[in-house]
Structure formats: C-alpha cells, structure tokens
C-alpha cells in the first residue's frame, strides 16, 4: 500500500471493526444431526488449519458467493474460516452436507483430518467503510483483515492461499477487472475486484515476457500515462534485479475511485489498485508494482513486520525511478520522513508478533514506509547497491511464496554482505526519531 493512502484510510477505518455473529452461533448441515451428514463429523474449531486453495464465484447482482476450498491435513477433524458478516447458507463436500456452526465471525466445519475439499455458499453485504464490497463505488477493499466480509478466509498476513475468481452480475455497460487466477500463494487481502467504465492501455512488455498495462476511467488517460511512464521498464528492472515474478504474466495498475482524497494504492497483485487522486504519481505506481516481490511475493510473518513490506518497496521504488527515469525521490522522501516523525513518531519494528490491530495502531502511518526506506539506503551506503541487491534477491528467492520476518532480512543482509546492520536497524527501526 502506498504511504499516501495511510492517513486517509486510517480515518475511514478508525471506527469500524469485524461484525460478529451472535455468540450462540448457527448450526448447519441442513438441519441434520452430525451423525447423518456426509462425513459424520461434528463441527469443531481449528483456526490454524491451512487453506491451500480457494476458488470463488461472486455474483455482484445477487450478492451471492460460492467458495470451493481445499484445506490441508491436520491432527484434528475441524477447520475454521473467518466469515465476518457473511450469511452462510450451506457447507458441503462431494458427498453431501457437512456439519458447521457460525459464531463470533468464524465458520467452524467438521471435515476430517485428511486434506479435504468443501464448498461454502453464502451471501455478502454492501459496505461503505473500506471493509468489504464497496457497492457505491463497485470496488472491493479487504486490507488488512476484511477478507471475511467477502469470502471465507484467513486474514493473518503470514497465511498464503492460491486463489481463483469468477465474477458475474456485472452491468452490461461496465467492465469487471480482476484476476481469474493467482497461481502462487498470496495473502487473502491481495484479491480484488473493480467494476467501472475501464479502458485498458498496454504500457509495454518486460524481457521476461510480462505484459504491463493500466486500466483507467473516463477522463483519466493523461494521468494514467503520466503515472505509468516507463512502468514496464521498472517492472523489468525488478525482475532482473530481484527475481522472477510469480503472480502471472500480465499485470496492471487499476484506477480505483476512492474519492478526491483517496491517495495512494493497494497491493492487489497482479492487478493492483491506485486511487484516482494518485494516478498521475509515478512513485505510487512503482511502489505498488514492487509489492509483487515484498509484501505479496514474500509475505510478512506478523503485522509488526509491516516495515519489511512497506519500507522495502519504498526503497525499491526509489531505486527503480533512479534506474529507469534518472529521478531522485530522496528529497521528497526526506520531507515525508520529517512529516511522519512530527505528526506521530513510533517504533517502525515492534518486538511483538500479531499483538496489534494494525489499523488502530500508530504503526499504520508513514513511519515504517520512510524509516524502512532510509534504513535500507543507509545499508546501501555501507555495502554498495550491488551487494544490497544481491542480498535482497537471495532473500526473495529463499522466501518467495512464504512468510518471513524483518529480522530474517537483517540476518540475510549480514550473511550476504558481511556487514552487520543491527546498529542501523536499532537507530532507524527500533528507536524514535532517526540517526
């Protein structure tokens, strides 16, 4: 997510939270006793059971969804999914109905301990607080923990799932922009849908064969061309410098009608969203593109590792702009850093793991973006850009499709360059102010 969006969405989300079902829950399996359902297994909770794949069908006209889910094996016989304010109507497998219950925003199912497939049918609601399907603007907004308001999911950033999507119920005069398939493990919030009067413009193709483009709205061509200038070359630079892109061979920036104050973007690879107010801003487009490597390609282990995602891609965007445009963005980054510290300084790398609610925590600010970028720049000044790039590339190769922590990146930098970044990390990431 581009840093300029943080302040806007913080205000919009400050008062919202996951809507829960009544504590008593709702029992399913079509009214059958657990002993009579397809597996004869009573519903039970297992919040940690891994979701391997989710194939979604969303009808935007009826607000009906179907999720075909594959879960990994487990020692127990239950599986649990975040369902927010979804109205779950059935849970089945190929043999028939499964026993389920919905309580506290979670769906618990009895599925057995082996790898299992199940199908959940449900209704989803309109939302207006950037926390689900935004009917007024025909957009989804699921970051950071609102995927359960659109489909059964796990919202923890470390959890990865292979996603596919089919969308129906789109007005005849509109275009729905979404990825039909995301072939590599991705955080659940990465999935997105945008419906509008979109026109596609091809920007170019990288040496690896990745087509880079932009979807813009009426009267948005000039801004789209300005913001995505040389975006194909930047994407090519990311591929050559850090490694192969894993979310397909066609990517694009998508204009998102978040309103006149909705700045920044959101890392919905391979079709990331950029607010219409930021469509002319190259930094935002380059930043969101870089999330294909850090934040999405390599997921963060904890929300407290936010700097691994946002600080790293802020640094990468600056490097890419210098490489393909000869543009120095560090003076503007310095202004952003100064403003972030003045407005509300905080520790960029907390010592806890998933102990915070990010959208209600001071960490959700420009601080991790800018302190993270300047930290990596300080490392670059010690070891040189080529050596740091080799370390970042190795880290990406070793962790792509998985979750990792900022400490693991620090360890990789030390191992690959021989330079121990601890002192710099303590000054930039674990302290108030800056060195």
Regions inferred by a protein language model and the residue ranges of each:
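Post-HExxH zinc-binding segment in Zn-dependent metallohydrolases
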Residues: 238, 265-273, 277, 305-346, ...
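Amphipathic alpha-helical substructures
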Residues: 246, 330, 358, 365-435
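Extended, low-hydrophobicity, Ser/Thr/Pro/Gly-biased non-transmembrane segments
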Residues: 63, 121-201
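Surface-exposed beta-strand/loop patches in extracellular or lumenal glycoproteins
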Residues: 68-87, 151-170, 407, 411
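Ser/Thr-rich, Pro/Gly/Ala-heavy low-complexity intrinsically disordered linkers and tails
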Residues: 1, 12-46
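A surface-exposed beta-strand-loop module
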Residues: 83-136
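Juxtacatalytic substrate-recognition/specificity segment
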Residues: 67, 102, 165, 200-305
């Amino acid at each position: 997510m581009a840093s300029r969006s943080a302040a806007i969405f913080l205000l919009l989300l400050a008062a919202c939270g996951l809507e829960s079902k009544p504590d008593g829950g709702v029992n399913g399996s079509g009214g059958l006793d657990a002993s009579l359902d397809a597996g004869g297994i009573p519903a039970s909770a297992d919040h940690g059971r891994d979701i391997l794949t989710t194939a979604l069908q969303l009808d935007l006209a009826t607000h009906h969804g179907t999720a075909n889910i594959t879960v990994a094996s487990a020692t127990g016989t239950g599986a649990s999914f975040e369902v927010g304010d979804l109205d779950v109507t059935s849970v089945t497998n190929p043999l028939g109905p499964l026993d389920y219950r919905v309580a506290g925003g979670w769906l618990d199912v009895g599925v057995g301990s082996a790898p299992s497939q199940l199908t959940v049918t449900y209704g989803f609601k309109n939302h207006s607080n950037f926390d689900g399907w935004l009917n007024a603007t025909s957009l989804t907004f699921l970051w950071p923990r609102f995927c359960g308001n659109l489909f059964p999911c796990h919202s923890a950033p470390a959890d990865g799932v292979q996603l596919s999507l089919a969308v129906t119920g789109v007005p005849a005069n509109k275009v729905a922009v979404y990825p039909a398939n995301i072939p590599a493990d991705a955080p659940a919030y990465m999935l997105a849908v945008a419906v509008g009067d979109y026109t596609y413009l091809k920007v170019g193709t990288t040496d690896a064969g990745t087509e880079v483009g932009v979807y813009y709205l009426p009267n948005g061509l000039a801004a789209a061309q300005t913001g995505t200038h040389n975006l194909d070359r930047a994407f090519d630079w990311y591929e050559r410098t850090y490694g192969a892109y894993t979310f397909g061979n066609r990517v694009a920036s998508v204009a998102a009608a978040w309103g006149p104050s909705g700045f920044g973007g959101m890392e919905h690879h391979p079709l990331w969203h950029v607010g219409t107010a930021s469509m002319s801003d190259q930094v935002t487009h380059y930043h969101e593109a870089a999330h294909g490597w850090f934040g999405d390609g390599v997921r963060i282990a904890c929300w407290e590792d936010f700097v691994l995602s946002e600080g790293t891609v802020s640094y990468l965007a600056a490097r890419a702009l210098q490489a393909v445009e000869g543009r120095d963005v560090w003076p503007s980054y310095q202004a952003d850093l100064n403003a972030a510290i003045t407005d509300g300084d905080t520790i960029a790398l907390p010592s806890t793991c998933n102990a915070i609610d990010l959208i209600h925590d001071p960490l959700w600010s420009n601080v991790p973006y800018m302190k993270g970028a300047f930290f990596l720049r300080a490392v670059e000044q010690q070891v040189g850009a080529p050596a740091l790039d080799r370390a970042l590339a190795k880290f990406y190769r070793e962790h792509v499709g998985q979750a990792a922590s900022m400490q693991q990146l620090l360890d990789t930098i030390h191992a690959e360059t021989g330079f121990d970044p601890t002192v710099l990390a303590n000054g930039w990431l674990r302290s108030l102010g800056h060195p």
